[in-house]
Amino acid sequence: MRYRTLGKDLTVSALGLGCMGMTGVYGEAADRSAMIKLIHDAFDRGVTFFDTAEAYGPFTNEELVGEALAPIRDKVVIATKFGFDINLKTGERSGGVNSRPEHIRAVAEAALTRLKTDRIDLFYQHRVDPAVPIEGVAGVIMDLVW
């Protein structure tokens, strides 16, 4: 496997595993234990970059990825996203986008719990919210990083 550096020091496998389809975003959810095995098999073959999002499920994909990667957390890079207007308690979708700073912070906190981790390695905007200036989005991300 080849590896690349993102930014200053985030080393990832050249091939990443997008986990969206594992929890039924399109069609039926795959067998949970089979998907955990697939994630482990990918890691065993050198994949260290795993992508998920709150919107997948919603929430169930982050939970699956968190469970699968918990035993090897310090050896992998996890990416997740924000930007949809999803009720963080019920999972109900409004059909819109939401990148208000307070929502981004809440999504990050909830993702940490679902992913069973103390950090999100790559956290990015899934959909642009035209109601929120990009400077506001960048500012809250910078606050979360520091």
What are these regions (language model features)?
Residues G21-G24, Y56, F84-L88, H126-D129:
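Feature marks short, surface-exposed loop/turn motifs that line or immediately flank catalytic pockets
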